[in-house]
Amino acid sequence: MRPRPTRVRASTITAIPRAGAVTPVASPCPFCNPDPGRVLFEDGLVRVLSDGFPVSPGHTLVVPVRHVASFFETTPAEQTAVLAALAEARRRVDTQHRPDGYNVGLNDGPAAGQTVLHCHVHLIPRYAGDRPDPRGGVRWVLPEKAAYWDRDDP
């Protein structure tokens, strides 16, 4: 299976190339200035977007407004805001889509599968029967580690 390409949309941010001068520059980050049609809600620290390539109906992203690549570079206030927005997004998805469960995921760094280097948390609604056997969840990232319940080793 080939990886899907990441949609990139230029946005305008400001850079300070020399003391006191502010110049607009193009940013290829799709989360810094997202398509307004994808923004579900936001506050000063985070925005919640519908995913551009949804895994399932209701797939949502929680994104810090500040451009930061790693969750571990976010401030405590941003981390708190991400968790609060995740809970609110879940309430909204529950109302609209009525899923049977959720996967919450964060790929931090290219080695972990992060393709857009702006921190974002996935809220992926799951539905009974969407996979024949959903056990293992995120463990399927490394297939040889996934079916731990079938192994004899401790």
PLM region descriptions:
Residues 2, 8-154:
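HIT superfamily nucleotide-processing domains
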